[in-house]
């Protein structure tokens, strides 16, 4: 329970202090916001006031003739008009402030500036508010709805993704899926969630996820999420799993054995695989986001090596960069040749070419297991493919900066970058491209839809009908969507 606040009398020295909290810089002097408290609540009003002021908005503590925008939450047009009539009358000739729904405020905060007022924002006219689609128009599967890279509910989705990640660290598949699916729905909504009523009818919003969102809407933070992010368990598991070659099971074993830092791992090299040793050796570089420019530079290097080895072969950038991301933690490439069979044995030659240039810091080669392609298609339970591939750490050349006299020494001439090279036959390329583009959750949902709604098995090798023993053929990603009866979503809309 919040402590009772002492009533401050008008004109007292304390009243001046209480109302003197606006920030030093007001970026939008023509906009003066008053947050009406009745349905909003005192703590939420205080939070929203701090948020707006931190972004340069002018928020007034008292209703007066200076107010240009009154913002209300969970209030009908009729209630808003009654509220305004009950307030002290403004001086003659003063314009009435706009009565606006909280959605105008949240959209303005997201934009970093006042957004244009639309009819849906105004409370003066009793029109039905436009809210995000509910279950009738919000498909249950992430592969049925667009998920843009930039969406309207980042704060909310990231909180649920934190809880999903923590559940994954505990091998709690049920909680992981519940939070992941709810977060994915938020990414597909066409506008910000400003009130809990907007979640009604949306798929995958159970009691727990709804409670988290409610706390975030009311207080701007969620105690459970905060505790998870600050916990030693979560931070250690996150640290260990960011090391190349370390999965959840290994990280958990190390945690149970009392290990907490990377230095402790380095002191016990006997417990590390070669891949993990390389991950620790180049950890500083590998934990630094890879820029799109770096990914494109790597593509040029790999394309040159591939052309030298097999003219006519193509190299395609996949993963998050294909979905529109400007940075990532690794770079994935698919290599193929239009004449099926020409790609066999290509990767070792490409790696040899890269090694001769001194670009390979580490690589682990996996030969192809495509001898029985029909068998690979029937592996419905496996998300791993059988393509020829190499998990690498490449040294990407960096422009050398000359050191000035007395300055720090020049920067390193290369940067370690995680790279996956995958070789696929041309007949399986559309499925491989779809699978390696992601996102991981989008692909999981696509396989679930194929299995549960169509009775088909989908993986990076192809699409298979287990009843009719039939293998489907496709020449593009669009073909795969069409075979599944789905509307095609471009890569930029697959950030589920």
UniProtKB/Swiss-Prot annotation:
Species this chain originates from: Mus musculus
Gene Ontology, cellular component aspect: nucleus
Name of the protein this chain belongs to: DNA-directed DNA/RNA polymerase mu
Chemical reaction(s) catalysed: DNA(n) + a 2'-deoxyribonucleoside 5'-triphosphate = DNA(n+1) + diphosphate
Residues the entry annotates as binding Na(+): 241, 243
Responsible for the low discrimination between dNTP and rNTP, annotated site positions: 435
Enzyme Commission code(s) on record: 2.7.7.7
Note: DPOLM has a reduced ability to distinguish dNTP and rNTP as substrates, and elongates them on DNA primer strand with a similar efficiency. It is able to polymerize nucleotides on RNA primer strands.
Cofactor: Mg(2+)
């Amino acid at each position: 329970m919040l402590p009772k606040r002492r009533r401050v009398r008008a004109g007292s020295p304390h009243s001046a202090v209480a109302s003197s909290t606006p920030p030093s810089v007001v970026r939008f002097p023509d906009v003066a916001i008053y947050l009406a408290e009745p349905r909003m609540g005192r703590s939420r009003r205080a939070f929203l006031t701090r948020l707006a002021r931190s972004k340069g908005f002018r928020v007034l503590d008292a209703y007066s003739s200076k107010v240009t925008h009154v913002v209300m939450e969970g209030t009908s047009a009729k209630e808003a008009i009654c509220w305004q009539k009950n307030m002290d009358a403004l001086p003659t000739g003063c314009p009435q402030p706009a009565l606006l729904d909280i959605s105008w405020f949240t959209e303005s905060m997201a934009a970093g500036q006042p957004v244009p007022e639309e009819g849906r924002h105004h409370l003066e006219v009793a029109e039905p508010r436009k809210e995000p689609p509910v279950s009738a128009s919000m498909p249950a599967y992430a592969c049925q709805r667009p998920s843009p890279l930039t969406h309207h509910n980042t704060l909310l989705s990231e909180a649920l993704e934190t809880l999903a990640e923590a559940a994954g660290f505990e091998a709690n598949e049920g909680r992981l899926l519940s939070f992941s699916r709810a977060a994915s729905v938020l990414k597909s909504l066409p506008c910000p969630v400003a009130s809990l009523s907007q979640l009604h009818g949306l798929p995958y919003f159970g009691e727990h996820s709804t409670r988290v969102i409610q706390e975030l809407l009311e207080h701007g933070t969620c105690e459970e999420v905060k505790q998870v992010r600050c916990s030693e368990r979560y931070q250690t598991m996150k640290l260990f799993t960011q090391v190349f070659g370390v999965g959840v099971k290994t990280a958990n074993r190390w945690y149970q054995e009392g290990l907490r830092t990377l230095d402790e791992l380095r002191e016990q090299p006997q417990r590390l695989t070669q891949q993990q040793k390389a991950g620790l050796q180049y950890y500083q570089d590998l934990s630094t986001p890879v820029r799109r420019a770096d990914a494109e530079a790597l593509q040029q290097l790999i394309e040159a090596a591939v052309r030298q080895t097999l003219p006519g072969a193509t190299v395609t950038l996949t993963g998050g960069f294909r979905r529109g991301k400007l940075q990532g933690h690794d770079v994935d490439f698919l290599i193929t040749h239009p004449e099926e069979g020409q790609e066999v044995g290509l990767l070792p030659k490409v790696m040899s070419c890269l090694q001769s240039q001194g670009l390979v810091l580490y690589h682990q080669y996996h030969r192809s297991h495509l001898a029985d392609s029909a068998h690979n298609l029937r592996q419905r339970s496996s998300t791993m493919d059988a393509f020829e591939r190499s998990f690498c750490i490449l040294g990407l050349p960096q422009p050398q900066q000359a050191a000035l006299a007395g300055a720090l020494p020049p920067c390193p001439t290369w940067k370690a970058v995680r790279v996956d090279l995958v070789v696929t036959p041309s007949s399986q390329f559309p499925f491989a491209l779809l699978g390696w583009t992601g996102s991981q959750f989008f692909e999981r949902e696509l396989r679930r839809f194929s299995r549960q709604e169509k009775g088909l098995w989908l993986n990076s090798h192809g699409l298979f009908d287990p009843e009719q023993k039939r293998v489907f053929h496709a020449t593009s990603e669009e073909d795969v969507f069409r075979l599944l009866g789905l509307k095609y979503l471009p890569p930029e809309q697959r950030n589920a």
